[in-house]
Amino acid sequence: MAAQVPTEALKELNVAEGSQKPGATAQSKTDAAGDEHGGDDSEDEADGHVDGAAPTGEATKKKKKRKPKKKKKHPTSQTDPPRVMISQLFPNKAYPKGEEVEYKDENNYRTTNEEKRHLDNLNSDFLADFREAAEIHRQVRQWTQKTVKPGQTLTEIAEGIENSVRALTGHDGLTEGDAMKAGMGFPCGLSLNHCAAHYTPNAGNKMVLQQEDVMKVDFGVHVNGRIVDSAFTMAFEPKYDNLLQAVKDATNAGIREAGIDARVGEIGGVIQEVMESFEVEIDGTTYPVKSIRNLTGHNILPYSIHGTKAVPIVKSNDQTKMEEGDVFAIETFGSTGNGYVRDDMETSHYAKRGDSQHVDLRLSSAKNLLNVINKNFGTLPFCRRYLDRLGSDKYLLGLNSLVNSGIVEAYPPLCDKKGSYTAQFEHTILIRPTVKEVVSRGDDY
């Protein structure tokens, strides 16, 4: 989920020379495996008869052997659409690791250092939660890439992804507090064409995916508040291939540079250099691919998708360092437009602010809605469809009151100029003591 650079911070960005173009402005977890009580039903087969008495026909008959109980079999593959809980496919919680990358230069010793390896081993629950969330993300997105086609409504696509995530976590989010144990880390974003981020359909939305569209699919999965944030772009016409390749390569460049003691401003410079080495020809016109300079990656905290650190996607003087134990979403956005986004269209994404102060709310609808948010989402982002799903109604006045009071943050869609095309790719990386782990890496990207 994209983080936006505050407007005043843009003035501090030292954008690499030559990158500006004319006109340009970033649980109850259900162990479905269960206890399997196999039936080792031992039986004493008695031929018993009374001494001195002639054995009768009945007494000489052996007892019937009882058939042993059949052991429950664990599912071995995912369904279509995905509905098998991931814990059933991995009953021992041995979830796949992400891509492990050794640190470079002065941090290379960490890979074999015994003390660092010990620290890594202490993080078993932390790693298991992230790897479970990542495997759910991989299975759901690979199903999405296979099944989503032009002609589907955005609502159908978003709900298909979200319902699959809930099924694989085993938490449908309909009972109080259930969505905070595991489920959606934030709403499924489906941003089309010039819209780069934070768009998901509200109730009644009739928008249909078209053959010529470029769609950013950005969704999060959390387990115990540990959020995996990963995104990809879908296009159905080969003319957009270079745009998608530019952004994918830029994201991978950022991942390569990330690590302990890496400075985020320098990472941004590498991302920009790779991104802006591409151009794309669309319908006979050639466009330079630009990094969207007021969007950034970000670190991730428990139950908080946007932490306190940002990873720019253009060169800057930001000297903030990545540190051991950090979790980062490395995401990049490329555009054929201005390389700058503004708020546009109807807002759908919201999140309760972690730093919000107590406010005396006068509207009863605002008080009631805040109670729903606290019990079902906490500081996890939500959208209006999620409130509808919980049975909330006539909440818009209360929601606006919470936003105006500074309790809830609104995240409107972020768009470049109309007629342009934008693309996004994103991975979550764990800055472990011994290696960095691209936990959301898959065969697809």
UniProtKB/Swiss-Prot annotation:
Which EC class heads this enzyme's classification? hydrolase
From the record, give the transmembrane residue ranges. none
Residues holding a divalent metal cation 1: 218, 229, 426
**In its keyword annotation, does this UniProt entry include Ribosomal protein?**
no
Single GO BP term: proteolysis
Q: Name one Pfam family in it.
A: Peptidase_M24
Q: Which positions in this protein are listed as binding substrate?
A: 198, 306
Q: In which residues is a divalent metal cation 2 bound? A: 229, 298, 331, 426
Localization in the cell = Cytoplasm
Stated EC number for the protein is: 3.4.11.18
Chain spans, region Disordered: 1-99
Q: Which InterPro entries match?
A: Creatinase/aminopeptidase-like (IPR036005), Met_Aminopeptidase_Type2 (IPR050247), Pept_M24 (IPR000994), Pept_M24_MAP (IPR001714), Pept_M24A_MAP2 (IPR002468), Pept_M24A_MAP2_BS (IPR018349), WH-like_DNA-bd_sf (IPR036388), WH_DNA-bd_sf (IPR036390)
Q: Name one GO molecular function term.
A: initiator methionyl aminopeptidase activity
One annotated Gene Ontology cellular component of this protein: cytoplasm
**What is its cofactor?**
Co(2+); Zn(2+); Mn(2+); Fe(2+)
Q: Which reaction does it catalyse?
A: Release of N-terminal amino acids, preferentially methionine, from peptides and arylamides
Q: Where is the composition biased (Basic residues)?
A: 61-75
Keywords, comma-separated and alphabetical: Aminopeptidase, Cytoplasm, Hydrolase, Metal-binding, Protease
Cofactor note, please?
Binds 2 divalent metal cations per subunit. Has a high-affinity and a low affinity metal-binding site. The true nature of the physiological cofactor is under debate. The enzyme is active with cobalt, zinc, manganese or divalent iron ions. Most likely, methionine aminopeptidases function as mononuclear Fe(2+)-metalloproteases under physiological conditions, and the catalytically relevant metal-binding site has been assigned to the histidine-containing high-affinity site.
Q: Which family does it belong to?
A: Belongs to the peptidase M24A family. Methionine aminopeptidase eukaryotic type 2 subfamily.
- Function of the molecule: Cotranslationally removes the N-terminal methionine from nascent proteins. The N-terminal methionine is often cleaved when the second residue in the primary sequence is small and uncharged (Met-Ala-, Cys, Gly, Pro, Ser, Thr, or Val).
Query: What is the protein name for this chain?
Result: Methionine aminopeptidase 2-1
- What is the organism field in this record? Fusarium vanettenii (strain ATCC MYA-4622 / CBS 123669 / FGSC 9596 / NRRL 45880 / 77-13-4)
